[in-house]
Amino acid sequence: MEKVNLTEKFSQFSEHYSPKIAGELNGQMVKLVKFKGPFVWHHHDNEDELFYVVRGSFEMEFRDKTVTINEGEFIIVPRGVEHRPNAKEEVHVVLFEPGTTLNTGNVKNEMTIDNLGRV
């Protein structure tokens, strides 16, 4: 059992929308990701996602509304719900989701990351 220092882990990478695995528990992955700018519209057929903001804030856009998630807050996006993260400034986010979750969900494009790195 070892503790994880999020500040130190986030300092190990600079890419946006490229999740890194920081831990695993019960089939779930703890992923660290930096957002800046809009991501691709997508949904996940089989997985819910939890987005916890460590630093900064971002807007989670849905087709019918936009929700601002600030530092210290989280949002759970249920499976099947189309969404798109969008950050005006860089934001640091912790994701909790099944290990099989593809970052772009039902969409395959240049933002899709098939093999996640570890920090």
Predicted regions, residues:
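Double-stranded beta-helix
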Residues: 2-10, 23, 88-119
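A short glycine-rich, His/Asp/Glu-containing loop-to-beta-strand
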Residues: 6-41, 47, 105
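Short, surface-exposed charged micro-motifs
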Residues: 21, 50, 59, 66, ...
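A cytosolic small-molecule/anion-sensing beta-strand core signal
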Residues: 26, 54-55, 70-71, 89
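Short, charged/polar surface micro-motifs in flexible loops or helix N-caps
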Residues: 27-29, 36-38, 57-59, 66, ...
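Short, conserved beta-strand element in jelly-roll/cupin
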Residues: 34-35, 44-61
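Short beta-strand His + acidic residue motifs that chelate non-heme Fe in jelly-roll/DSBH
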Residues: 42, 60-61, 77, 82-88, ...
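Short acidic-glycine-tyrosine-enriched beta hairpin
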Residues: 63-79
